[in-house]
Regions:
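Active-site/acyl-donor-binding loops of N-acyltransferases
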Residues: 109, 114-133, 234-287
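Flexible loop/N-cap segments at domain edges
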Residues: 178-180, 185-196, 200-239
Length: 287
């Protein structure tokens, strides 16, 4: 049994067994993680059999762990913990001592045993396109992310996530399953959205707006409407339970709580969590 650098070939056994996974979405998504940090994504292999995988995403002073998966034929043998500890070891070797995960509830006990602490719940909301109101405000523009320099987007993003994510943006804008849009007012960014699409839904990943903007509802609806791109698939949002106003805001624009939530957890040093205005977090594994 050994760790190997994660490659797309390591995904084949999961794709064959798990018919719920959409390969056209899953494969390019994992490729983003490998492209961003090829030395920090691992497969646990026994001979030619892939037993599990894990990814890491490093920013300025936090390291995200994501996509922890163990083949169901090999569960309850400690392999999940082994993969987690490998990821933690890699992050710490890079002199990053704040390790962050978005944990499914079923795995929370494992993470707590390793030493992770809960910070908040991330609640999932569903929004149907026909609930999104048309934009009646002409004071701002909604444009494709490609309309502005990535440095400008990264600077705006930094105010909310407190990490430089420029290199990640550079990778995901080339993923055909991602689309991104910005809201501009007087040439200034006041919000942005990324959406990723699979065969059944659209997933907001993330949605950030200036909540002090006088037309925040119109701004949010405008970003969501263009992100739908005339599709009828539901949008899913991952809303951090940091402030009750977030839930109230999303329900006021027509989003419905699904009842499902995950846990944001961390290990090691405290870090600065997202600032006010992050209505939906990004994909688990990269924040």
């Amino acid at each position: 049994m050994e760790f190997q650098p994660l490659t797309i070939k390591h995904l084949e056994s999961r794709l064959k067994k798990d018919l719920e996974v959409d390969p056209s979405w899953f494969v390019p998504h994992i490729q983003n993680f490998i492209s961003y940090n090829p030395k920090g994504c691992f497969a646990l292999v026994n001979r030619d059999k892939t037993l599990g995988i894990v990814t890491t995403t490093l920013y300025d002073n936090i390291g995200w762990i994501g996509w922890l998966y163990v083949d169901d034929s090999f569960r309850h043998q400690g392999l999940g913990e082994r993969l987690m500890r490998k990821a933690i070891e890699y992050i710490n070797k890079n002199k990053i001592y704040s390790v962050v995960i978005e944990a499914v509830r079923e795995a929370a006990t494992l993470y707590q045993r390793i030493g992770f602490e809960s910070q908040f719940e991330t609640h999932h909301f569903k929004l149907y396109p026909d609930k999104i109101k048309p934009n009646q405000n002409n004071n701002f523009q909604i444009l494709p992310i490609s309309s502005i320099p990535r440095e400008k987007l990264a600077d705006f993003d930094f105010k909310y996530f407190h990490q430089n994510r420029h290199e990640l943006f550079k990778i995901i804008v080339n993923n055909p399953k991602f689309s991104g849009y910005i809201a501009l007012e007087n040439k200034k960014i006041i919000g942005y959205i990324f959406v990723t699409e699979d065969s059944k839904s659209l997933q907001v990943s993330p949605l950030v707006i200036n909540l002090n903007h006088p037309h925040k509802y119109e701004l949010t609806n405008s970003l969501l409407r263009v992100a739908c791109n005339d599709k009828e698939k539901p949008l899913y949002l991952r809303c951090p339970s940091l402030r009750k106003q977030y839930f109230d805001f999303l329900t006021s624009i027509g989003a419905e709580p699904t009842g499902y939530f995950t846990y944001r957890m961390f290990l090691g040093k405290q870090y600065e969590i997202e600032s006010e205005g992050v209505l939906s977090l990004g994909c688990p594994g990269k924040g």
